[in-house]
UniProtKB/Swiss-Prot annotation:
Organism: Methylacidiphilum infernorum (isolate V4) (Methylokorus infernorum (strain V4))
Gene: rplT
Record's function text: Binds directly to 23S ribosomal RNA and is necessary for the in vitro assembly process of the 50S ribosomal subunit. It is not involved in the protein synthesizing functions of that subunit.
One CC-aspect GO term: ribonucleoprotein complex
Superkingdom of source: Bacteria
Cited NCBIfam families: rplT_bact
Name of protein: Large ribosomal subunit protein bL20
Signal peptide (from-to): none
Length: 120
């Protein structure tokens, strides 16, 4: 009896993997064995870094808000506390954008937070 190799399916699987490795350099895009390892690592890194991206952006927003607050004489943590007490519900992403692109609007929010904090 002849040996069954499942050749069509194996070829399809290898072809798909090499197609996914297009754009990689050298033998990582040409040879199945190296392409398989390269794809495994690429997928591992992309999964991991999708999680890290969220942390990095949050840290960036906090740094930008902190810089804008310190320029106006208050620390980041005091400013966030003042915002909460004043009942201003603007997220960090928007605050960071305002601090960088529209400083007049950030000044208004800062003033509101400061007044709201003094009132309570």
């Amino acid at each position: 009896m002849a040996r069954a190799t499942n050749a069509p399916q194996s070829r399809k699987r290898r072809k798909r993997l090499l197609r996914d490795a297009r754009g990689f350099r050298g033998r990582r895009s040409k040879l199945f064995r190296y392409a398989k390892d390269a794809l495994y690592k690429a997928r591992y890194w992309s999964y991991r870094d999708r999680k890290n991206r969220k942390r990095e952006f949050r840290a960036l927003w906090i740094q930008r808000i902190n810089a804008a607050c310190r320029k106006r004489g208050m620390t980041y943590s005091r400013f966030m506390e003042a915002l909460r007490k004043a009942g201003i519900g603007v997220n960090r992403k928007m605050l960071a954008e305002l601090a960088v692109r529209s400083q007049e609007d950030f000044d208004q929010i800062f003033k509101l937070a400061k007044e709201g904090n003094l009132a309570s």
